[in-house]
Amino acid sequence: MRLISRYTHFMILLPGILMRGHQVASRPSKDYPYSSLEKQKPYFKSLGLDLSPYFNGTLNISIVPLEFEMTKPEFTFPLVEWTDLHPPETFSFSRCKVRFQGKEYTGWVYYPHPETKKTHFQNPSLIEVITYEIEGIQYGDVIDIEVNPQEITIKGYTPAP
């Protein structure tokens, strides 16, 4: 882990491991006849965040033993009514980058607020990222993530001297 300077602010670079998620963001399920992210994107676009260039799924990156907290995200969309299958949800987004096998991909930390998403437990050591499709990536792969410490607090993180 290290602090790196990018443009006008600092980013924190964290090592992570790609984990399997609930799989509702990326594919249809018995409760959802579509991927949830595919259904949510038009709502986010109408609110000012265009995610259409990105893959219709999320990377679930474990940063254990660290934990993250979305503190001052670039975007927060309160109580988005994107489906009639459950109550409205609040979502926050913070720009990020992921690195895999020497390539860098821009994207967004995607944070469905757990207080409005009662049916899913949100692991505070698992960061969900929306980015471009990454060829060849598999569960268990090492993947680095850069996050903005002005928007996301990393609990247990100590910058290198």
Describe these PLM feature segments.
Residues 63-65, 113, 149:
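Non-catalytic surface loops within mature trypsin-like serine protease
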Residues 140-145:
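Loop/turn positions that initiate beta-strands
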Residues 79-136:
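Glycine-rich active-site loops that engage anionic ligands at enzyme catalytic sites
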Residues 131, 147-149:
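Conserved "cap/hinge" positions at secondary-structure junctions
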Residues 9-86:
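Anionic-ligand-binding alpha/beta catalytic cores of soluble enzymes and soluble regulatory domains
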